[in-house]
């Protein structure tokens, strides 16, 4: 017998589209078999009906032959021979009737009954298991949808536990029903062969027994053939029993796995994450926009193929291209209060698709895999080794810390070297750029820690700056909170969110800011850090001040003369950063870069900083100051008007822009 195709029980839990596609082939085969079995049963019942009719007909014939004697023929003389002959024929017909009756009974037991049992037992079982599998799959999809909607923040642990148990129960139920369904379909491939041959064996045996007295030669030839067929059926029966035992043992082993196999995100604290993947596959939730403000999430099967991200819905024969991953960027994002979301951005900076994984492990592995693929590692001779090396370097460079003191302690001595390539020692506005782009190691030392918290908390800075001042219990600021701002010609405020800061080795080029942006964003993506501190950045002609929007207390203050470099991101216009030169107690100076995300364009913040530096320069020359004041419009109170109050086109709330760019 040729090998029989079968469904792999090990793939039942994953429930991939490939398995579903193969399952549909088995289901189509079962449907075809059901239709054919019904037609075959009708034909066999017709034969059985004809045989029963033959029994009734021969019985009636025998009676009718005997009835000849009782007929009152007008010319009935000489009928005794006929009557005796008919009596003999009646006995022959009675004997023949016995043979037909025996044949009819044998056809019912060996031909019709097996095919009816096959239809009512095996085919009905497959149909019932199919319905149960469909119900279990629907319950699992509903529970996964409910689990996916769990909020990320302030979530009820009891609800989370209950939903997790519900997902595990639904997944276990789907696994059990799929295993039973797969086993039934696999066994059906054997049983259908037996079901087709066993009835015909019974039919043939019945006919042979019926004609045995007059067909010894024929029966001998048929006996040899039927013997071989019976041996084949017996061998199939042996194979079925062995396969059934094998599937039973395999089913028990698969059902005895740890409970964590069914529970999503089972190891939240310390999942085993493989950051060296160059290919990945699994189910993700895809965010689709259905209107101006409405979205839907669809659970689909995604997999990578070379440098492409593919998607394959259930029932589809093959996957389709969703995103070209070459030179793309990926990072974790907050989206609609859902957990484990990440966004793929195209090389031109446009936002791509947003996907949601079912666990932290899956989320980080997808991010790492896409990040590896985007670097075209898969084209190298040994992509796994390249991925391991790159991720080791990245982890060393982006180890996060949240203590400003630790950051200063771990800074390398090379970060405190004073740069000698400034245009002059009076802190010119724009440092002189180098002739060629420096390497990343020349800008930032490998392994430099990144600080994700703001420099000082608001309460600590309040105690340091205000001393014994009375604290307003209502959080309102005092009029004299920032006395130096009242005397400043320049006052401009922006809404910013702090992304991170790190020590740098040089401030001779803006490339150091771009490299710091890259490392900070990469660190946030790798370590799954979403939290950002929002502040008001006030730019004056003396300083840059970060103000708590709730308490109006200054979080950090940088002298404008200590700002040696500032730049906005070339593609993401809302990213802005600046380099601060701070003197150390040892007499040397340290350089640190600070990265922010702004509600407005970063170029506007850079323009304000640049103007503040110009004011510092021209304040030494009254004539130059007068020319500068004439060249720039002023407000009624004599402050500089830097920016209009019109919102950007790509922001939805004008009030946010007026708040972000209002004058203090």
From Swiss-Prot:
Pfam families in the cross-refs: BAR_3, PH, PID
Region annotated Required for RAB5A binding, chain positions: 1-428
Subcellular location: Early endosome membrane; Nucleus; Cell membrane; Endosome membrane
SMART domains, per database record: PH (SM00233), PTB (SM00462)
Keyword Transmembrane helix: no
Keywords: Cell cycle, Cell membrane, Cell projection, Chromosomal rearrangement, Cytoplasm, Cytoplasmic vesicle, Endosome, Membrane, Nucleus
Domain of life the protein comes from: Eukaryota
Record field: compositional bias (Basic and acidic residues): 654-664
Disease implication from the record: A chromosomal aberration involving APPL2/DIP13B is found in patients with chromosome 22q13.3 deletion syndrome. Translocation t(12;22)(q24.1;q13.3) with SHANK3/PSAP2.
Name of the protein in question: DCC-interacting protein 13-beta
Gene from which this protein is expressed: APPL2
